Amino acid sequence: MSSKQQLACTYAALILADSGKTDMDSLLKVTKAAGVDVSKGMASAFASILKNVDINDVLSKVSFGGVAPAAGGATAAPAAAAAAAAPAAAAAKKEEEEEDDDMGFGLFD
């Protein structure tokens, strides 16, 4: 039951993050509206933890394991990907054409 309450409080905190109001009453209202029975103690614990935490700031600092691209690289990435894909597609087509041609070097000719 406790993990269900923790998960409900976590989701409620994420929902309330934009309003900046993650107090006990707000957490209880959101969890009650979701149909989850959360104890006042659990909501109070989450509220006290989140009192001095900016959830949006925490979420913006989450790393997914990759290296972040440079700021200027974000706009050039789609164009670069398209440019890289074009020669690869042409090379694949050329290889396909070469495979179809009989060069006379077959093993069973």
Swiss-Prot record:
- Family, per entry: Belongs to the eukaryotic ribosomal protein P1/P2 family.
Query: What function does the entry list?
Result: Plays an important role in the elongation step of protein synthesis.
| GO terms under cellular component | cytosolic large ribosomal subunit
Annotated source species = Trypanosoma cruzi
For this entry, the protein name equals Large ribosomal subunit protein P1
Give me the ranges of the annotated region Disordered: 90-109
Has the keyword Iron-sulfur been applied to this entry?
no
This protein's UniProt keywords: Phosphoprotein, Ribonucleoprotein, Ribosomal protein
Question: Gene3D superfamilies annotated for this entry?
Answer: 1.10.10.1410
One annotated GO molecular function = protein kinase activator activity
Q: Please give the subunit comment from the record.
A: P1 and P2 exist as dimers at the large ribosomal subunit.
The record's Gene Ontology biological-process terms are: cytoplasmic translation; translational elongation
Q: Name one Pfam family in it.
A: Ribosomal_60s
